[in-house]
Amino acid sequence: NVPAGAVEWVLLTDTTAPATGPQGAAHVFGPQKGATRDDIEVLDRGLARLCEVADVDPATPGLGAAGGVGIGITWLSTMLHGDSSHVHILPGARVVADSNGLAEQVAGAALVITGEGRFDGQTGTGKVASVVGELAREADSVFAVAAGHFDEQPDAGTIAVTLPETDNVREQLTQAGAEIAVAYLNTSTVQG
């Protein structure tokens, strides 16, 4: 779609991962999608080749998001404009938080709660949980995160609750909320 390529592209990503390399899309996201080590190497080489053919810098932060969709958009824009200056890759969680005044809303909160499917090495690369955690720390609020699984532990002082393994979402959230409330009441010196 050539007319679409002629616009200014603002890509909001949920990760700062580049397209390739040890912190790239294949290495960071492949394992959670079921890719083996061999698969990851093939995927990484494929993304590197795509970047080479498209003349796109694979080290650009955020290009690893959404399976490398930004690579194609950057290539199209470069073909039409001669450079990639019409593609702007921004941290999506931060942009959404800022546009909704989340920092101001968190500022008066004693406890801030968020969730994450899997809390792992990629959580800190721009995911919602990391942005909400930063805002909570800046506001001196207690921060809690509920996740389906924790591969890594959150920062010290964070209340971390693993969701129970059940298909009943209401039950998961009710139990997680209760655990967070108890942990907060047991550790907080200022309640209410």
Stretch-by-stretch model annotation:
Residues 1-192:
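N-terminal loops that bind phosphate or other acidic moieties
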